[in-house]
Amino acid sequence: MRVAYRHFQPVTVFYARGVGPYGQSAQHAWGAMVSWLDQHQARKRVKQAFGLFRDNPNTTAADLVRYDACIPVMLDADFPPAPGIGRQTLPGGAYAVHTHVGSYDELGGLLSHLHSRIVPERALCVDYDRPFMTVHLNDPAVTREVHRRTEVCVPVVPIAMPLPRNDAGRHAPDTAALARRLARAG
């Protein structure tokens, strides 16, 4: 599995939340998001979308697992608020990223493999304070399933790498520098 390391900047998004097992909650959230975009004739303006996996399905009851379907806030968007559509800022930081081409049905297995096997093998630790996510790079409405490109992203921190010091002499994380180090080491 090819894995790159990337530092994501925080981004403000519109989101729709689905609750329940990930297969069902993702379908519900994307249905609500696409419906809202279509109401405003805005779907074609979306160039990238994010799927956020908020909970660990192994430790959270299935009916409480949360999934957020997200699109970046467009600067000229003057859409009125709608029930079920919120606004939030995705946290930035370092992520281990695998680019998948093909069916969305494979994303859960890829996230699990990246999380449980690849990240530990590369001396990284998962940052459970940030969500696992997928970055959807094309529109499934116009892209054949075999050509759909999705980045599968697991938030990471190093296990054994010195952190830079801040002004007070305490260790302070610098995730941009971390991402550069990881990219060189990868």
Model-predicted segments: where are they?
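A solvent-exposed interaction/effector surface
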Residues: 1-186
